[in-house]
C-alpha cells in the first residue's frame, strides 16, 4: 500500500485543503490527514474539533484517514506510519520557498519524499487565516469551506 501524509493544522479546513487531499487520493492508496497543533498559535477550533470536522468532510472516502499528528519530526512520523511521501499544497511561490527547505531536510533525514500539488486556480487566494478573519467580521465564507465547517463556524 502506498501511503502519504498530508499534514496541517486545518484551522479551519477549507476547500483548498479539500482539493489537495482529494487529488492526493488519486496518487496514493491511503492519505493520512495528520492534524497538528502549533503551540505558538491560537487555534479557533480544538484539535479534537478539527479532527472531527476533517473526518466528517471525508466520511465518504475510505482512502482518507484522519488522526492527530504526533509531536516530533514529521519525517519520523511518516517513517513510523510507513508513508512514502508527504503531500503539500502550494498556492504560490512563497509557499514553495517556505516548503522546499523542509522537504529537503525531511528527505535527508529519513528519505521521505514531498509531493507538491499546485492549488486549484479558483482557490489560490484562500487560506485558513483569511477564512477566519472574514468569518469573524461577519463575511460570507460559504464558497471557501465545506458545509460541515460552515456549520461549525456559525455555531461558535
UniProtKB/Swiss-Prot annotation:
Q: Which GO terms describe its cellular component?
A: cytoplasm
Residues given in the record as ATP binding sites: 9-10, 17, 89-91, 99, 123-129
Task: List GO BP terms, alphabetically.
Answer: coenzyme A biosynthetic process
Instruction: Look up keyword Transmembrane helix and say if it applies.
Output: no
Name the top EC class: transferase
Which keywords does this Swiss-Prot/TrEMBL entry list? Answer: ATP-binding, Coenzyme A biosynthesis, Cytoplasm, Magnesium, Nucleotide-binding, Nucleotidyltransferase, Transferase
Site Transition state stabilizer — annotated at 17
Enzyme Commission number(s): 2.7.7.3
UniProt xrefs under InterPro entries: Cyt_trans-like, PPAT, Rossmann-like_a/b/a_fold
Recorded catalytic reaction(s): these are: (R)-4'-phosphopantetheine + ATP + H(+) = 3'-dephospho-CoA + diphosphate
Q: List required co-factors.
A: Mg(2+)
Q: Which residues bind substrate?
A: 9, 41, 74, 88
Q: Which GO MF terms does the UniProt record name?
A: ATP binding; pantetheine-phosphate adenylyltransferase activity
Pathway it acts in? Answer: Cofactor biosynthesis; coenzyme A biosynthesis; CoA from (R)-pantothenate: step 4/5
Any idea where this protein resides?
Cytoplasm
Known HAMAP family for this protein?
PPAT_bact (MF_00151)
Free-text function comment from the UniProt entry: Reversibly transfers an adenylyl group from ATP to 4'-phosphopantetheine, yielding dephospho-CoA (dPCoA) and pyrophosphate.
Question: How does the record describe its quaternary structure?
Answer: Homohexamer.
Q: Which family does it belong to?
A: Belongs to the bacterial CoaD family.
Which NCBIfam families does its entry note? coaD_prev_kdtB (TIGR01510), cyt_tran_rel (TIGR00125)
Q: What is this protein called?
A: Phosphopantetheine adenylyltransferase
Which gene specifies this protein's sequence? coaD
